[in-house]
């Protein structure tokens, strides 16, 4: 497939913020094994570590995420 690699994360994937995203930090996709981390950028304000986020854009391995209101 096009642009599919180890870091391919589809839009709509839910993930856990492992670090604060200010605006860049680390996330782990909820559907992937523990220990698989991705760098992501928050689209809006600071996202706290432990928050659930959703991938809104994935482009050349660069992930843009938005916090999911619980």
Task: Write out the residue ranges for each language-model feature.
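Terminal membrane-proximal soluble interaction domains of membrane-associated proteins
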Residues: 2-70
């Amino acid at each position: 497939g096009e642009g599919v690699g180890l870091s391919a994360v589809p839009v709509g994937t839910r993930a856990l913020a492992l670090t604060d995203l200010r605006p860049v930090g680390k996330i782990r996709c909820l559907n992937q094994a523990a220990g698989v981390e991705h760098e992501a950028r928050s689209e809006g304000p600071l996202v706290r570590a432990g928050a659930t986020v959703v991938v809104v854009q994935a482009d050349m391995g660069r992930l843009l995420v938005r916090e999911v209101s619980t």
